[in-house]
């Protein structure tokens, strides 16, 4: 019985730091928040300017293995909508999964490439994953957004 109690206590004491090691500390969350917001704003700026070759470099390794640079750029050019910016009504939020994996939840204002007055706001969750010391985006998600067609069309 004493061995069982000792084993349980050791398991709790030794296992507890491992469980908490996966969650960022408040200081780490603040640093991650600042870093990812800058990365996200930079990525959004590239998207606004339709600089798809540079966006591709910010893609996750898995995405780049599936999509070639040419495929990605072609699919992005074919999209009718580009972001104008972030909605001022609701600030972006970060949903942490681990120190190296998070979702940036943002309300993005999109504008039609041909009809500039046609705009809409859509909430989007962007997956960011840290690879080789840099935050990377899911490019597959990018070629599918924003999926909107005006009513009465």
Describe the predicted segments one by one.
Residues 17-21:
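Sec/Tat signal peptide C-region and signal peptidase I cleavage site
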Residues 23, 28-31, 37-38, 42, ...:
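Short solvent-exposed beta->alpha transition segments
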